[in-house]
Swiss-Prot record:
This is Fructokinase. PROSITE patterns: PFKB_KINASES_1, PFKB_KINASES_2. Disulfide bonds: none annotated. It comes from Solanum tuberosum (Potato). Transmembrane segments: none annotated.
Length: 319
Protein backbone atom coordinates (compact mmCIF):
# COMPACT_ATOMS: atom_id res chain seq x y z
CA UNK A 1 0.00 0.00 0.00
CA UNK A 2 1.19 3.51 -0.77
CA UNK A 3 0.03 6.84 0.60
CA UNK A 4 0.85 10.23 -0.81
CA UNK A 5 -0.63 13.72 -0.92
CA UNK A 6 -0.76 17.12 0.72
CA UNK A 7 -1.62 18.37 4.20
CA UNK A 8 -5.14 17.66 5.34
CA UNK A 9 -7.50 18.31 8.20
CA UNK A 10 -10.20 16.23 9.82
CA UNK A 11 -12.68 15.04 7.24
CA UNK A 12 -14.11 12.51 4.88
CA UNK A 13 -12.45 9.36 3.51
CA UNK A 14 -13.79 8.59 0.02
CA UNK A 15 -13.28 5.05 -1.26
CA UNK A 16 -13.52 4.44 -5.01
CA UNK A 17 -14.03 1.18 -6.87
CA UNK A 18 -15.94 -2.09 -6.76
CA UNK A 19 -18.46 -3.66 -4.42
CA UNK A 20 -19.66 -7.20 -4.98
CA UNK A 21 -21.00 -10.39 -3.44
CA UNK A 22 -18.48 -12.95 -2.20
CA UNK A 23 -19.69 -16.55 -2.01
CA UNK A 24 -17.48 -18.33 0.52
CA UNK A 25 -17.55 -22.14 1.06
CA UNK A 26 -19.07 -23.19 4.34
CA UNK A 27 -16.05 -25.42 4.96
CA UNK A 28 -12.36 -24.72 4.41
CA UNK A 29 -9.85 -26.73 2.42
CA UNK A 30 -12.12 -27.78 -0.46
CA UNK A 31 -12.44 -26.78 -4.11
CA UNK A 32 -15.46 -24.83 -5.35
CA UNK A 33 -16.86 -28.03 -6.85
CA UNK A 34 -16.46 -29.91 -3.57
CA UNK A 35 -18.01 -27.20 -1.37
CA UNK A 36 -21.27 -28.40 0.21
CA UNK A 37 -22.59 -24.85 0.34
CA UNK A 38 -21.66 -21.19 0.31
CA UNK A 39 -22.05 -18.26 2.67
CA UNK A 40 -23.13 -15.06 0.93
CA UNK A 41 -21.03 -12.10 2.09
CA UNK A 42 -20.81 -8.51 0.84
CA UNK A 43 -17.33 -7.54 -0.30
CA UNK A 44 -15.11 -5.62 -2.68
CA UNK A 45 -11.93 -4.05 -1.32
CA UNK A 46 -12.85 -0.33 -1.63
CA UNK A 47 -16.26 -0.94 -0.06
CA UNK A 48 -14.64 -2.97 2.71
CA UNK A 49 -12.33 -0.05 3.47
CA UNK A 50 -15.24 2.40 3.58
CA UNK A 51 -17.08 0.25 6.13
CA UNK A 52 -13.89 -0.45 8.08
CA UNK A 53 -13.58 3.32 8.56
CA UNK A 54 -17.11 3.81 9.87
CA UNK A 55 -16.90 0.67 12.03
CA UNK A 56 -13.99 2.41 13.79
CA UNK A 57 -15.87 5.69 14.20
CA UNK A 58 -14.59 7.49 11.11
CA UNK A 59 -16.44 9.22 8.27
CA UNK A 60 -16.48 7.63 4.81
CA UNK A 61 -18.21 7.61 1.44
CA UNK A 62 -18.21 5.12 -1.43
CA UNK A 63 -18.03 5.94 -5.14
CA UNK A 64 -18.83 3.18 -7.61
CA UNK A 65 -21.50 1.44 -9.67
CA UNK A 66 -23.79 -1.46 -8.84
CA UNK A 67 -26.31 -3.43 -10.86
CA UNK A 68 -29.92 -2.27 -10.65
CA UNK A 69 -30.77 -5.67 -9.20
CA UNK A 70 -31.52 -7.19 -5.81
CA UNK A 71 -27.85 -7.71 -4.98
CA UNK A 72 -26.96 -4.15 -5.98
CA UNK A 73 -29.64 -2.57 -3.83
CA UNK A 74 -28.78 -4.94 -0.99
CA UNK A 75 -25.14 -3.80 -1.12
CA UNK A 76 -26.13 -0.13 -1.21
CA UNK A 77 -28.31 -0.77 1.82
CA UNK A 78 -25.41 -2.41 3.66
CA UNK A 79 -23.25 0.66 3.05
CA UNK A 80 -25.97 2.96 4.36
CA UNK A 81 -26.67 0.72 7.36
CA UNK A 82 -22.98 0.91 8.24
CA UNK A 83 -22.97 4.70 8.07
CA UNK A 84 -21.18 5.05 4.72
CA UNK A 85 -22.32 7.98 2.59
CA UNK A 86 -23.87 6.54 -0.57
CA UNK A 87 -24.18 9.72 -2.67
CA UNK A 88 -21.51 8.42 -5.03
CA UNK A 89 -23.31 5.20 -5.99
CA UNK A 90 -24.77 4.71 -9.47
CA UNK A 91 -26.96 1.84 -10.68
CA UNK A 92 -26.77 0.18 -14.10
CA UNK A 93 -29.95 -1.32 -15.57
CA UNK A 94 -28.11 -3.31 -18.21
CA UNK A 95 -25.45 -5.09 -16.15
CA UNK A 96 -25.49 -7.22 -13.03
CA UNK A 97 -23.72 -6.72 -9.73
CA UNK A 98 -20.41 -8.61 -9.70
CA UNK A 99 -20.10 -11.99 -7.98
CA UNK A 100 -17.00 -13.78 -6.74
CA UNK A 101 -16.71 -17.37 -5.53
CA UNK A 102 -13.86 -17.62 -3.06
CA UNK A 103 -12.13 -20.91 -2.30
CA UNK A 104 -10.76 -21.09 1.24
CA UNK A 105 -7.76 -23.35 1.62
CA UNK A 106 -7.16 -25.11 4.92
CA UNK A 107 -4.89 -22.24 6.01
CA UNK A 108 -7.57 -19.62 5.31
CA UNK A 109 -5.90 -18.28 2.16
CA UNK A 110 -8.05 -17.74 -0.92
CA UNK A 111 -8.47 -18.46 -4.60
CA UNK A 112 -11.03 -16.59 -6.71
CA UNK A 113 -13.54 -17.23 -9.50
CA UNK A 114 -15.22 -14.05 -10.76
CA UNK A 115 -18.51 -13.47 -12.59
CA UNK A 116 -18.25 -9.96 -14.10
CA UNK A 117 -18.22 -9.91 -17.90
CA UNK A 118 -19.10 -7.13 -17.73
CA UNK A 119 -20.46 -6.31 -14.30
CA UNK A 120 -21.92 -2.93 -13.38
CA UNK A 121 -18.79 -1.70 -11.60
CA UNK A 122 -16.86 -1.92 -14.88
CA UNK A 123 -19.29 0.45 -16.62
CA UNK A 124 -18.97 3.56 -14.44
CA UNK A 125 -18.32 6.59 -16.68
CA UNK A 126 -16.62 9.92 -15.88
CA UNK A 127 -19.92 11.76 -16.41
CA UNK A 128 -21.53 9.71 -13.62
CA UNK A 129 -19.03 10.78 -10.96
CA UNK A 130 -20.24 12.85 -8.01
CA UNK A 131 -17.45 15.41 -8.29
CA UNK A 132 -18.62 17.48 -5.31
CA UNK A 133 -18.37 14.41 -3.09
CA UNK A 134 -14.90 13.60 -4.41
CA UNK A 135 -13.74 17.20 -3.91
CA UNK A 136 -14.86 17.02 -0.28
CA UNK A 137 -12.52 14.08 0.44
CA UNK A 138 -9.58 14.58 2.75
CA UNK A 139 -8.40 11.07 1.85
CA UNK A 140 -9.17 9.44 -1.51
CA UNK A 141 -8.62 5.66 -1.45
CA UNK A 142 -8.63 3.33 -4.45
CA UNK A 143 -7.42 -0.01 -5.80
CA UNK A 144 -6.44 -1.35 -9.22
CA UNK A 145 -9.44 -3.40 -10.35
CA UNK A 146 -11.21 -0.24 -11.52
CA UNK A 147 -8.21 0.44 -13.81
CA UNK A 148 -8.58 -2.75 -15.85
CA UNK A 149 -11.13 -1.77 -18.52
CA UNK A 150 -12.96 1.22 -19.97
CA UNK A 151 -15.05 3.16 -19.21
CA UNK A 152 -14.32 2.61 -15.51
CA UNK A 153 -10.62 3.24 -16.05
CA UNK A 154 -11.32 6.76 -17.33
CA UNK A 155 -13.74 7.37 -14.45
CA UNK A 156 -11.06 6.22 -11.99
CA UNK A 157 -8.40 8.52 -13.47
CA UNK A 158 -10.83 11.46 -13.52
CA UNK A 159 -11.77 10.90 -9.88
CA UNK A 160 -8.09 10.73 -8.89
CA UNK A 161 -7.37 13.95 -10.76
CA UNK A 162 -10.24 15.79 -9.07
CA UNK A 163 -9.29 14.51 -5.61
CA UNK A 164 -5.64 15.44 -6.08
CA UNK A 165 -6.51 18.95 -7.31
CA UNK A 166 -8.72 19.39 -4.23
CA UNK A 167 -5.74 18.57 -1.97
CA UNK A 168 -6.75 15.08 -0.83
CA UNK A 169 -4.27 12.55 0.50
CA UNK A 170 -4.17 9.70 -2.03
CA UNK A 171 -4.16 6.13 -0.71
CA UNK A 172 -3.57 3.15 -3.00
CA UNK A 173 -3.88 -0.58 -2.28
CA UNK A 174 -3.40 -2.65 -5.45
CA UNK A 175 -5.59 -5.56 -4.32
CA UNK A 176 -4.05 -7.66 -7.10
CA UNK A 177 -6.44 -10.18 -8.70
CA UNK A 178 -4.61 -11.60 -11.73
CA UNK A 179 -7.63 -13.58 -13.07
CA UNK A 180 -9.28 -10.23 -13.86
CA UNK A 181 -6.39 -8.97 -16.01
CA UNK A 182 -5.79 -9.95 -19.64
CA UNK A 183 -2.17 -10.79 -18.76
CA UNK A 184 0.39 -10.39 -15.99
CA UNK A 185 2.25 -7.89 -18.17
CA UNK A 186 -0.87 -5.76 -18.50
CA UNK A 187 -1.37 -5.83 -14.73
CA UNK A 188 2.21 -4.75 -14.12
CA UNK A 189 1.80 -1.91 -16.58
CA UNK A 190 -1.04 -0.43 -14.56
CA UNK A 191 0.35 -0.98 -11.07
CA UNK A 192 4.01 -0.20 -11.67
CA UNK A 193 3.22 3.50 -11.87
CA UNK A 194 1.47 3.52 -8.53
CA UNK A 195 3.89 1.40 -6.45
CA UNK A 196 2.42 -1.93 -5.54
CA UNK A 197 2.76 -5.42 -4.20
CA UNK A 198 6.40 -6.13 -3.72
CA UNK A 199 6.77 -9.67 -4.98
CA UNK A 200 4.68 -9.16 -8.10
CA UNK A 201 6.41 -5.97 -9.18
CA UNK A 202 9.99 -7.03 -8.47
CA UNK A 203 9.59 -10.65 -9.57
CA UNK A 204 11.35 -11.66 -6.36
CA UNK A 205 10.10 -13.50 -3.30
CA UNK A 206 12.57 -11.53 -1.22
CA UNK A 207 10.83 -9.19 1.21
CA UNK A 208 13.58 -6.78 2.16
CA UNK A 209 14.28 -3.05 2.31
CA UNK A 210 16.10 -2.99 -1.01
CA UNK A 211 13.14 -4.51 -2.85
CA UNK A 212 10.66 -2.23 -1.13
CA UNK A 213 12.66 0.91 -1.80
CA UNK A 214 12.76 0.07 -5.50
CA UNK A 215 9.10 1.13 -5.42
CA UNK A 216 9.80 4.48 -3.80
CA UNK A 217 9.23 7.79 -5.58
CA UNK A 218 9.56 11.36 -4.25
CA UNK A 219 5.82 12.06 -3.95
CA UNK A 220 5.22 9.21 -1.51
CA UNK A 221 4.62 9.96 2.14
CA UNK A 222 4.29 6.35 3.29
CA UNK A 223 4.90 2.96 1.68
CA UNK A 224 3.69 -0.17 3.45
CA UNK A 225 4.38 -3.84 2.80
CA UNK A 226 1.96 -5.99 4.78
CA UNK A 227 3.18 -9.42 5.91
CA UNK A 228 0.06 -11.14 7.21
CA UNK A 229 0.36 -12.31 10.81
CA UNK A 230 3.98 -11.12 10.82
CA UNK A 231 2.83 -7.48 10.72
CA UNK A 232 4.14 -4.94 8.24
CA UNK A 233 7.17 -3.00 7.07
CA UNK A 234 6.92 0.77 6.71
CA UNK A 235 8.95 3.31 4.73
CA UNK A 236 8.86 7.12 4.79
CA UNK A 237 11.25 9.81 3.55
CA UNK A 238 12.91 9.97 6.98
CA UNK A 239 12.71 6.49 8.50
CA UNK A 240 11.73 2.89 7.98
CA UNK A 241 11.10 -0.14 10.15
CA UNK A 242 8.69 -2.93 11.00
CA UNK A 243 5.73 -3.59 13.28
CA UNK A 244 4.82 -7.04 14.55
CA UNK A 245 1.48 -8.71 13.97
CA UNK A 246 -0.85 -10.90 16.00
CA UNK A 247 -1.32 -14.65 16.18
CA UNK A 248 -5.02 -15.48 15.99
CA UNK A 249 -7.08 -18.47 14.84
CA UNK A 250 -7.44 -17.66 11.15
CA UNK A 251 -10.67 -18.70 9.46
CA UNK A 252 -10.74 -16.48 6.36
CA UNK A 253 -8.20 -13.84 5.30
CA UNK A 254 -10.72 -12.01 3.08
CA UNK A 255 -10.80 -8.33 3.99
CA UNK A 256 -7.85 -8.39 6.39
CA UNK A 257 -5.84 -5.96 4.28
CA UNK A 258 -8.87 -3.72 3.83
CA UNK A 259 -9.40 -3.66 7.58
CA UNK A 260 -5.74 -2.70 8.03
CA UNK A 261 -6.07 0.13 5.50
CA UNK A 262 -9.32 1.42 6.98
CA UNK A 263 -7.77 1.56 10.43
CA UNK A 264 -4.71 3.40 9.17
CA UNK A 265 -6.72 5.97 7.23
CA UNK A 266 -9.09 6.56 10.13
CA UNK A 267 -6.14 7.48 12.33
CA UNK A 268 -4.21 9.67 9.89
CA UNK A 269 -7.13 11.59 8.36
CA UNK A 270 -7.28 13.63 11.58
CA UNK A 271 -3.54 14.10 11.96
CA UNK A 272 -1.23 13.67 8.99
CA UNK A 273 1.70 14.66 11.22
CA UNK A 274 1.63 11.02 12.36
CA UNK A 275 3.44 10.22 9.12
CA UNK A 276 6.39 12.32 10.30
CA UNK A 277 6.59 10.82 13.81
CA UNK A 278 7.91 7.25 13.86
CA UNK A 279 6.76 6.41 17.39
CA UNK A 280 3.20 7.54 16.70
CA UNK A 281 3.16 5.87 13.30
CA UNK A 282 4.20 2.56 14.86
CA UNK A 283 1.31 2.84 17.34
CA UNK A 284 -1.13 3.42 14.49
CA UNK A 285 0.29 0.52 12.48
CA UNK A 286 0.09 -1.78 15.49
CA UNK A 287 -3.58 -0.81 15.84
CA UNK A 288 -4.06 -1.44 12.12
CA UNK A 289 -2.45 -4.88 12.41
CA UNK A 290 -4.83 -5.71 15.24
CA UNK A 291 -7.81 -4.77 13.07
CA UNK A 292 -6.52 -6.91 10.22
CA UNK A 293 -5.95 -9.87 12.52
CA UNK A 294 -9.46 -9.73 13.99
CA UNK A 295 -10.94 -9.71 10.49
CA UNK A 296 -9.37 -13.11 9.75
CA UNK A 297 -11.22 -14.79 12.61
CA UNK A 298 -14.60 -14.89 10.80
CA UNK A 299 -15.86 -15.81 7.32
CA UNK A 300 -16.44 -12.94 4.91
CA UNK A 301 -14.99 -9.45 4.95
CA UNK A 302 -17.59 -6.90 6.04
CA UNK A 303 -19.19 -9.00 8.80
CA UNK A 304 -15.72 -9.51 10.31
CA UNK A 305 -14.54 -5.87 10.36
CA UNK A 306 -13.82 -4.88 13.99
CA UNK A 307 -14.86 -1.99 16.18
CA UNK A 308 -12.25 0.11 17.94
CA UNK A 309 -13.01 -1.54 21.27
CA UNK A 310 -12.39 -5.00 19.78
CA UNK A 311 -9.06 -3.86 18.38
CA UNK A 312 -8.04 -2.29 21.69
CA UNK A 313 -8.92 -5.51 23.50
CA UNK A 314 -6.58 -7.47 21.24
CA UNK A 315 -3.87 -4.84 21.69
CA UNK A 316 -4.11 -5.11 25.45
CA UNK A 317 -3.86 -8.89 25.22
CA UNK A 318 -0.64 -8.66 23.21
CA UNK A 319 0.50 -10.88 20.39
Amino acid sequence: MAVNGSALSSGLIVSFGEMLIDFVPTVSGVSLAEAPGFLKAPGGAPANVAIAVTRLGGKSAFVGKLGDDEFGHMLAGILKTNGVQADGINFDKGARTALAFVTLRADGEREFMFYRNPSADMLLTPDELNLDLIRSAKVFHYGSISLIVEPCRSAHLKAMEVAKEAGALLSYDPNLRLPLWSSEAEARKAIKVSDVELEFLTGSDKIDDESAMSLWHPNLKLLLVTLGEKGCNYYTKKFHGSVGGFHVKTVDTTGAGDSFVGALLTKIVDDQAILEDEARLKEVLRFSCACGAITTTKKGAIPALPTESEALTLLKGGA
